[in-house]
From Swiss-Prot:
The gene is atpG. This is ATP synthase gamma chain. F-type ATPases have 2 components, CF(1) - the catalytic core - and CF(0) - the membrane proton channel. CF(1) has five subunits: alpha(3), beta(3), gamma(1), delta(1), epsilon(1). CF(0) has three main subunits: a, b and c. The lineage of its organism: Bacteria, Bacillati, Bacillota, Bacilli, Bacillales. It comes from the Bacteria. The keyword Protein transport does not apply.
Amino acid sequence: MASLRDIKTRINATKKTSQITKAMEMVSTSKLNRAEQNAKSFVPYMEKIQEVVANVALGAGGASHPMLVSRPVKKTGYLVITSDRGLAGAYNSNVLRLVYQTIQKRHASPDEYAIIVIGRVGLSFFRKRNMPVILDITRLPDQPSFADIKEIARKTVGLFADGTFDELYMYYNHYVSAIQQEVTERKLLPLTDLAENKQRTVYEFEPSQEEILDVLLPQYAESLIYGALLDAKASEHAARMTAMKNATDNANELIRTLTLSYNRARQAAITQEITEIVAGANALQ
């Protein structure tokens, strides 16, 4: 049985851990509130640019563009959004597991795919498995701006435009609520889903439709990446908040259990001392 000193040491250590996890929970809650607002604020912009792009692409004249048309697939790109830090429950492991299983199922050779990764956790995961990472970015702020992601987004879209990739998929955690995040797979390029937009507005084009699409489509694809990043950041903070809350609750439960054990051990020690004193007194009589 553990000594009173050992139990007391464990209680003090667990209390310190509880204080740390509680502080991290509060920090994550604050970050989540702002990240959630950022993600929600970006939705109207995305809805409007999607409407405009769809109308330009599918309007009168039916202009075609390489970013809108499916082509034979020789190489696939995977854009994976993870975090730079851990302590976020299954936030990273869920999305990485899905990507890894998908790649193993679809491809027989590393020559058939390449990975663009956002976040140190994902970068470490793929490098340890010798999987081809063609682009990466780490150390993004907790509340990233479009400027923070613009360069890698531009390069990612460029890899499809120059024929390096024939299709591009994006994997991230979609924010549903503070207690629910869903791993999401989205086909980023080609933009074949624009045909699903039923709303139509007639535009007069100046310059030509094709020239407008040359500018609009890359911007739209880059905006999709940024929108997914905002979504993923909200999910990250929510997952970390939940993980730290669970850790705090578990620590407090352990403290209660250890305190009970400490009191029982202390009571047993006192009882033993009293018994020995009484026995000694009786022996003297």
